[in-house]
Amino acid sequence: MAETETNPLVVFATVATIIISFVTLYFFKQSAKSSTTSSSSSSSSKSKKGSPALIPDKFQKFPLISKTQVSHNSAIYRFGLPNPTDTLNLPIGQHISIGTIIDGKEVVRSYTPISLGDQQGHFDLLIKTYENGNISRHVAEKQVGDFVEIRGPKGFFTYTPNMKKSLGLIAGGTGIAPMYQIITAIMNNPEDKTKVHLLYANVTENDILLRDELEQYAKEHPDRLKIHHVLNEAPEGWQHLTGFVTPELIDKHLPKPSADTNLLLCGPPPMISAMKKAAVSLGFDKAKPVSKLGDQVFVF
């Protein structure tokens, strides 16, 4: 019987096939391992950063976790987010809405948090309680552990670092809230060179909100922040401004109108109406009925 002769080409092809199979299996395992590691890393990173807690068109419930009285009729309310790493993801200068049902009707009121949008785990609202204020009384009656319904973000103003060389801010009462948020963002960012000038109007000295925090920022950043308090009813020995915010005060203490300046207003309607007229008399653009980003004069 003749001996079968092995074909070298067949042997080579067989060996090559085996080698290719091993190489393919090796790289498949490495790829799977890399993918798993990447997925785990991505998941860990996402968990670490947390998630935005707000939904623009849907009210969600957030628990009240603390209440700090800052004047006879105003308090800072701290609300918890679902997870310790969650954030509001609220652009600087925008606001949220609190809603509830009163006498069968939905009532909604907007507030700007004084905490920044990237604050993790909670957010703070500065709210003044008015006798006829449905939402302010609704919140004031809440106890720690109770929930409020909130949605957002909303608003037409978004602050970005160095968007203008200077900002003139005029605030009355709790109208300081969006101004404080903007000031905090600027002063906490060493890359932001914006100069800020604030005229803050109140009735009495006890009505001044966030005074210590504002003056601490001014002390730490004297070249970037100037604060001018104005009181209708000034006590004896008051070292700041008295009366009402007038065109003369605006002209003296705030930046002049220019392409590199924004004038931001927030306060009671009568005050805002007077400030818009004063701004026009000083050469600023006329404020529009609804302010939009890019307007020289913006009303919150």
Curated annotation (Swiss-Prot):
Segments crossing the lipid bilayer: 8-28
Signal peptide region: none
Co-factor(s): FAD
Domain of life: Eukaryota
Pathway: Protein modification; peptidyl-diphthamide biosynthesis
A GO BP annotation: protein histidyl modification to diphthamide
Subcellular location: Mitochondrion outer membrane
Summary of subunit composition and partner proteins: Monomer. Component of the 2-(3-amino-3-carboxypropyl)histidine synthase complex composed of DPH1, DPH2, DPH3 and a NADH-dependent reductase, predominantly CBR1.
Family statement: Belongs to the flavoprotein pyridine nucleotide cytochrome reductase family.
Protein's name in the database: NADH-cytochrome b5 reductase 1
The species this protein was found in: Lodderomyces elongisporus (strain ATCC 11503 / CBS 2605 / JCM 1781 / NBRC 1676 / NRRL YB-4239)
